[in-house]
Amino acid sequence: MGDLKSGFEEVDGVRLGYLIIKGKQMFALSQVFTDLLKNIPRTTVHKRMDHLKVKKHHCDLEELRKLKAINSIAFHAAKCTLISREDVEALYTSCKTERVLKTKRRRVGRALATKAPPPERAAAASPRPGFWKDKHQLWRGLSGAARPLPISAQSQRPGAAAARPAAHLPQIFSKYPGSHYPEIVRSPCKPPLNYETAPLQGNYVAFPSDPAYFRSLLCSKHPAAAAAAAAAAAAAAAAAAAAAYYQVSAAGPQPKAAAGAGGPGSLSYRCKRKRGGAKDCLLAPHAGARRLLLLPRSYKAKAAAAAAAAAAAAAAAAGATCLERFHLVNGFCPPPHHHHHHHHHHHHHHHRAQPPQQSHHPPHHHRPQPHLGSFPESCSSDSESSSYSDHAANDSDFGSSLSSSSNSVSSEEEEEEGEEEEEEEEEEGGSGASDSSEVSSEEEDSSTESDSSSGSSQVSVQSIRFRRTSFCKPPSVQAQANFLYHLASAAAATKPAAFEDAGRLPDLKSSVKAESPAEWNLQSWAPKASPVYCPASLGSCFAEIRNDRVSEITFPHSEISNAVKRTDLTINCLAEGASSPSPKTNNAFPQQRILREARKCLQTTPTTHCADNNTIAARFLNNDSSGAEANSEKYSKILHCPEFATDLPSSQTDPEVNAAGAAATKAENPCTDTGDKTLPFLHNIKIKVEDSSANEEYEPHLFTNKLKCECNDTKGEFYSVTESKEEDALLTTAKEGFACPEKETPSLNPLAQSQGLSCTLGSPKPEDGEYKFGARVRKNYRTLVLGKRPVLQTPPVKPNLKSARSPRPTGKTETNEGTLDDFTVINRRKKVASNVASAVKRPFHFMANFPCPPSLIIGRDGDLWPAYSLNTTKDSQTPHKAHPIWKWQLGGSAIPLPPSHKFRKFNS
């Protein structure tokens, strides 16, 4: 060791020990890794070493001891690799440069892009600027063209901005995408900075910023609307182009008002859209859409926050929040405006459609006053708040859904909702007092819902899930919900027809039917859903509002509310029992999100939801509503099931139709039976609870389609069979908290959904024991003893089942289990394949049991409840055999297992 020289060198503040071997400073690679390059992944370092062709020296025992002596390596190290100083430097430089400079390069690149683009703006030739432009165009479109626009305008067309109608619109609406984009590209260079500094940016949803995309979405569907929107937007943008985003939003209403006052463009379009045609509405909505684009949920959330902050007074705050949503949706919301906007926003709205709208003005004011009552709840006037909230909700949901589903849909829907809202407001103006009262009751829920929703939508579905969990207050709404439910059901019952007639009905039709077809599927269901919301609303003031009135007013409300609900879906569901509409609306956007929200809402509000859900479903089923109505009697028992279906569908992809049908029936039934209604609510909630969410997420489409039939049929059977029991159980559970019913249904629901077959849950297949995986299974001791247990595993996972089953254990047990025949067959099969043999056995279905029904659910009080109780387990719908509840209770099986099963794990 004497000849080994050692020393220490400090590199970048790190003290490394080295040995001098053959005249070279050799550093312990382990120390270089752990100390010098500690923040750099080992794989990166190794790659760099390979790239640099670092020569490694494997130290001998003496060197190893020396390194330990100078504490360069761990005392317990058995070997060490040394690398030379040059290699350490090269490696360090390489790794650090690769990591640090990458970010630096990006920053530099951005800076260069920002600075260089001005010339490039003029030239518009640089590929990089083009890249930035494209990249930022999205931002531009999202945040509103205002900031980027000024930049572009400055750079390229000082006077051209005026020339281009869409110059100030988000690029998506730009008529000159080609020229605009370059500008956008350049402006984005600056705007990115602006956005970074701007609080709005973070919240923005990332829409495809492709102008063509939005334009195609909006313009293709509503060319006239696109033009009108472009004009209106241009005017608004021109006014607010340089203004901050908020101002732009604020400006939106003014231009819109101007358009409304000045010509058909805004007001007419809106009116037409509401009354005359979805297409016309869309025209106006384009402005709305533009605004919507400008008002991604993040802005909305911001607006909501701003509104809340600004609205020191609860009323003002409430109004602001709702307005914020509404404005955001319409692009009207300057955060400050929100308060008075909430009250006046409608006025703006109204002013836009001034003749009809102003009539609302008083009603709106009335509603705002109710808002005064409680900030969040009062926040939204029933219609207004609903619409605003709806819009806001839409925005927030819309933000979410935009990202998940389609921006254009969001925009359009928002527009539609805006229109709808106006429509709703107009109608409200017509039924001022009744509307107001309706608004007040509904507006509480709606505002709360919209507030929570808008916020949550920005957050995430998860947050929504939690929110829905926390929304226990809906139970309080239950009484109202039932009441609303009746009204809603009546409205839904009438509405479905109305909706069917919606095409013929001027107002409702315009909003609902015309918009539905003209706008997207989303919108179609949204309008339908919107009516649903109305019914809930109507529920509050149904006395004042006749069914037709409900149809008309509710419908617009509903539509807007629905939009709101989409976002506020959970809240609304809970608060208003309008979760279904919300989910439906949500459905259009992010189906899964909607599903989740729907199920959340349903889950949260057993009764309330159901009513709204039914109504919503009926409305959503605008087209199917007649059928639904026709079937409503038939579904009276199924009602719960349809409700369930509705919830699930609303949660699911096709909720509109499926949920609509179920909802329609449900709505009608509820109207007929209050008692049943309550149960349906419970059922609905139960089903919709966790199961829907889990299953939807896995296979929302499947569930939607299957659920419609399955829920209806199976649930029909299930509910008819168990209705009396469930009714009692549910009633009792309702008293306990919807949690219990929820629990009960969820077990079934999860199965049904997981299987895509409610029937499996609702009505165990009598042939389960006899047929497995399509093969006839002998009824042996096991089958007799276990009964239809296989049903649980029958879930449609046949392929999975076989693969999931453990062939060996199955085969083994089967030998003991089976009768002689079975045994022989099994032996034969075993030889062929143990998997096949296991088919005869009660196999463990991996996925069938997988989304295990929740054993604990959130109760009304927000606390955890057992998902199943002796109550519910006694019902015909006992928990899934795989459910943990069987592990909690003694005698999980009434019948003892056969000896072969005694020690099996799957006997639960």
Swiss-Prot record:
GO biological process, one term: regulation of transcription by RNA polymerase II
Covalent crosslink: Glycyl lysine isopeptide (Lys-Gly) (interchain with G-Cter in SUMO2): K688
Spans annotated as Disordered: 337-461, 744-763, 792-818
Keyword Ubl conjugation in record: yes
Keyword Membrane applies: no
Compositional bias ranges of the Polar residues kind: 746-761
Residue ranges with Acidic residues bias: 411-429
Any one GO molecular function term: DNA-binding transcription factor activity
Keywords: Isopeptide bond, Ubl conjugation
Bias type Basic residues, positions: 337-353
Compositional bias annotation for Low complexity: 370-389, 396-410, 449-461
Pfam families on file: EPOP, Ski_Sno_DHD
PANTHER family referenced in this protein's UniProt entry, alphabetically: FLJ44216 PROTEIN-RELATED, SKI_DACH DOMAIN-CONTAINING PROTEIN 1
UniProt similarity note: Belongs to the DACH/dachshund family.
Entry protein name: SKI/DACH domain-containing protein 1
